[in-house]
Curated annotation (Swiss-Prot):
The gene is glyA. Homodimer. InterPro entries: PyrdxlP-dep_Trfase, PyrdxlP-dep_Trfase_major, PyrdxlP-dep_Trfase_small, Ser_HO-MeTrfase, Ser_HO-MeTrfase-like, Ser_HO-MeTrfase_PLP_BS, SHMT-like_dom. It holds the Pfam family SHMT. This is Serine hydroxymethyltransferase. Catalyzes the reversible interconversion of serine and glycine with tetrahydrofolate (THF) serving as the one-carbon carrier. Also exhibits THF-independent aldolase activity toward beta-hydroxyamino acids, producing glycine and aldehydes, via a retro-aldol mechanism. HAMAP family: SHMT. Gene3D superfamilies: Aspartate Aminotransferase, domain 1, Type I PLP-dependent aspartate aminotransferase-like (Major domain). It catalyses: (6R)-5,10-methylene-5,6,7,8-tetrahydrofolate + glycine + H2O = (6S)-5,6,7,8-tetrahydrofolate + L-serine. Residues 1-21 are annotated as: Disordered. Pathway: One-carbon metabolism; tetrahydrofolate interconversion; Amino-acid biosynthesis; glycine biosynthesis; glycine from L-serine: step 1/1. One of its GO terms (molecular function) is pyridoxal phosphate binding. It comes from Haloquadratum walsbyi (strain DSM 16790 / HBSQ001).
Length: 415
């Protein structure tokens, strides 16, 4: 993408933007929360809508000149309703976390109780971590995965819900590789007479394509990100039934935000249009197949894959059983040097710190966008294993880097 206008006024920024694009083209993105949107979505997010304030909602704006903002937002809403089958959709949240904030504003008062999955077991900061506003505003108790299986302990969750009596139970996770049984979590919510928030930030695309169970129609509120597995404009989304529609809309604006980022809403509209295609369904199916192949490859090499595999787009590896002296950060750094971008991650029963944890999290959404299938993903897994076995081997890093260069040339991005 030519950036001549930026280069004319700010060569430094133009260089950084061009370098970032080149970095993405020349490396393999395996951070589970990242993906590559289409040129069409990029174009929408860089459109003149970035200039437009549109406080309010379609047909009910606080400013004049919003006819095309209304049109774009209405398209995004209609397409989201079709994708996920929701009665009501709000596409204005700036992020998944702000979508969660709006739900909390709707359902809770300060001091009310949240029951959510522990962060080291696959939860998320916005579900009640002490460093997050949720942990500072609400009373939080957390449930865990079964230490033997790595699966959510649904019976333990019901017991904890009965004892803790939460006002809301949060499902949906940032590092949980198995399919979520939303109806079983709803049983726990019913037992406690609590709301149920399903945060599907990571799996919005998988749910839309029908390759993961949907919480829509089960949970009271469903939130998500719109730039991960769904490959739309960056931001968040909220879905609910009509009973909560007005409260949710008021919690987003004016409760949590001012004007929506209309250029991002445009990117959501375009990405949702793409996701309504048969090609997107095939993409989501391949994403899961690729993750399963990656999990099998790592398992075959003797690594400990949390829960024994995956049902979605990500694989979580506990390095301690096979490589007790190796940290996730050491593996992350070695792989980055070779052009494979993933992240160190905490694992259930973590014995190190969040800054230098014992695990790694890898995902296949971006590789699948590039056109990778099982055979190519298996090769990437084998390359990863070479550096996991010795993250300090410079010759191995160089050899893996050469192979990554070949793969990125064979499966180009934005060319």
């Amino acid at each position: 993408m030519e950036r001549s206008h930026i280069r004319d006024v700010d060569p430094d920024a133009a260089d950084a933007l061009s370098s970032e694009r080149q970095r993405q083209e020349d490396t393999l993105a395996m951070i589970a929360s990242e993906n590559h949107v289409s040129e069409a979505v990029l174009e929408a997010q860089g459109s003149a809508l970035t200039n437009k304030y549109a406080e309010g909602y379609p047909g009910e704006r606080y400013y004049a000149g919003c006819e095309y903002a209304d049109e774009i937002e209405s398209l995004a809403i209609e397409r989201a309703e079709e994708l996920w089958g929701a009665e009501h959709v709000n596409v204005q949240p700036h992020s998944g976390t702000q979508a969660n904030m709006a739900v909390y504003l709707t359902a809770l008062d300060p001091g009310d109780k949240i029951l959510s999955l522990d962060l080291t077991h696959g939860g998320h900061l916005s579900h009640g971590h002490p460093a997050n506003f949720t942990g500072q505003t609400y009373t939080v108790e957390q449930y865990e995965v079964d230490p033997e299986t790595g699966y959510i302990d649904y019976e333990g969750l019901k017991t904890k819900a009965d004892e803790f009596n939460p006002d809301i139970i949060v499902s949906g996770y940032s590092a949980y590789p198995r399919e979520v049984e939303f109806e079983r979590i709803q049983e726990a919510a019913d037992l406690a007479d609590a709301y149920h928030l399903a945060d599907i930030a990571h799996i919005t695309g998988l749910v839309a394509a029908g390759v993961h169970t949907s919480p829509v129609g089960v949970a009271d509120f469903v939130t998500g990100s719109t730039h991960k597995t769904i490959r739309a404009g960056r931001g968040g989304i909220i879905m609910c039934n009509e009973e909560h529609a007005d409260d949710i809309d008021n919690s987003v604006f004016p409760g949590a935000q001012g004007g929506p980022l209309m250029h991002n809403v445009a990117g959501k509209a375009v990405g949702f249009k793409e996701a309504l295609s048969d090609e997107f369904e095939a993409y989501a199916e391949q994403t899961v197949k690729n993750a399963e192949e990656l999990a099998n490859t790592l398992t075959d090499a003797g690594l400990s894959v949390v829960s024994g595999g995956t049902d979605n787009h990500l694989v979580l590896v506990d390095l301690r059983p096979s490589h007790p002296e190796t940290t996730g950060k050491e593996v992350e750094a070695a792989l980055e040097s070779a052009g494979i971008i993933m992240n160190a991650n905490t694992v259930p029963g973590e014995t190190r710190s969040a800054f230098n944890p014992s695990g790694i999290r890898v995902g296949t959404p971006a590789l699948t966008t590039r056109g990778f299938t099982e055979s190519t993903v298996r090769e990437v897994g084998e390359l990863m294993i070479e550096l996991i076995d010795d993250p300090t081997d410079d010759e191995a890093i160089a050899a893996v880097s050469d192979r990554v260069d070949t793969l990125t040339d064979e499966y180009p991005l934005y060319r």
